[in-house]
């Protein structure tokens, strides 16, 4: 059973809408770790960005296999049921969870926003646009006691 109040899992007995998980007080979260296979699908109200740095991984997103190639950035609205099904040889992956209100506040292309909010999985064409060094630095900044650095 999932204990994260902002996430739903397919093994829960009580169903909840991912839209009910929204909170304007949520902040962006960044994980930098080895990916792990998920026993069930889950969903949450944030936009999820994944970057595997040293190997390809495979997700099941809305019952469709989605491969994320090493070094590529993949973005999707995580209210769509998703499950990491194959970690391959990947040992280092960045996972960004962006609250929807934050994502929508950025000056992004309207087509991109439309694609994401309609369940499309967006993949970068180019590789290596983000480094592990940058991910670690952003993690440190988000966890800084200095509010000006966190912003």
Question: Predicted segment positions?
Answer:
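A hydrophobic/aromatic-rich effector-binding and dimerization subdomain
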Residues: 2-28, 81-144
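A structure-centric signal for secondary-structure junctions around beta-strands
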Residues: 46, 70, 90-92
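Conserved GNAT-family N-acetyltransferase fold
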Residues: 50, 74, 96
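A short, compositionally biased micro-patch
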Residues: 52-54, 77, 87
């Amino acid at each position: 059973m999932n204990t994260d109040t902002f996430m739903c899992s397919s093994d829960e007995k009580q169903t909840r809408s991912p839209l009910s998980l929204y909170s304007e007080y949520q902040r962006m979260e960044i994980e930098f770790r080895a990916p792990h296979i998920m026993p069930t699908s889950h969903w949450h109200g944030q936009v999820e960005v994944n970057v595997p740095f040293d190997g390809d991984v495979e997700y099941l997103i809305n019952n469709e296999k989605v491969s994320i190639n090493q070094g590529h950035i993949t973005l999707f609205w995580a209210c769509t049921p998703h499950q990491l099904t194959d970690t391959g040889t990947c040992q280092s992956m960045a996972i960004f969870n962006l609250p929807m209100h934050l994502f929508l506040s950025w000056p992004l292309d309207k087509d991109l926003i439309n694609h994401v909010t309609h369940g499309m999985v967006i993949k970068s064409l180019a590789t290596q646009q983000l480094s592990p060094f940058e991910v670690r630095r952003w993690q440190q900044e988000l966890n800084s006691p200095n509010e000006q650095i966190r912003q």
